[in-house]
A protein has these predicted regions:
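Two-component histidine phosphotransfer core
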Residues: 3-175
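C-terminal end segment of the histidine kinase catalytic
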Residues: 179-180
């Protein structure tokens, strides 16, 4: 996503003036993220560890956009046994959590969890709900629609997708069965 790339580069550029060590770390994360996107995303399945590292790098880069009003909680567990997953499966949900869940003028939160339960993988994302005006809803739902199609193709009959708009928050959970 060019918009993400340009925003991240601008954020890192500003960070260089304040904290060079952190800026250098974020450049490394951006490099890893781009490398993963270029070289791993064309594989049918990837090791879960690589996907977790990708999500972690992405989330850390998105934190650069957050101010003190935003709380970001991340709990990504590497499974005890080797598991494989479709690459970049959850990125649209993480993007949406930051896009719709973080507001620079209001208290906001994003909670992302990923864990193994036996042979299953469970991804959970919850974020504060800051509704946008109806005029700013172009393209709404395309990422989620594409995610559903990818799930149908890659995990037919082997996934569960739950989403809910709760009081002041949006919640989504995806369970992938038999990911060994």
């Amino acid at each position: 996503n060019p918009h993400f790339l340009f925003n991240t580069l601008n954020n890192i550029s500003s960070l260089v003036q304040i904290d060079q060590d952190t800026a250098q770390e974020r450049i490394g994360q951006l490099s890893d993220l781009l490398r993963y996107t270029l070289y791993e995303s064309n594989h049918e399945l990837v090791p879960v560890e690589g996907e977790i590292e990708f999500m972690s790098n992405y989330i850390e880069l998105m934190r650069l956009r957050c101010n003190e009003l935003a709380t970001v909680e991340v709990d990504l567990w590497i499974p005890p046994k080797p598991m494989r997953i479709v690459p970049l499966l959850f990125i649209s949900l993480i993007e949406n959590a930051f896009k719709h869940g973080v507001n620079s003028r209001k208290s906001s939160f994003v909670r992302i969890r990923f864990k193994a339960e036996g042979d299953d993988l469970v991804f959970t994302c919850e974020n504060s709900d800051h509704p946008k005006p109806d005029v700013n809803r172009s393209g709404s739902g395309i990422g989620l629609e594409n995610l559903r199609r990818r799930l149908d193709l890659a995990y037919p009959g082997r996934y569960r997708y739950d989403q809910a708009l709760r009081e002041n928050s949006y919640f989504v959970q995806i369970t992938l069965r038999d990911c060994l």
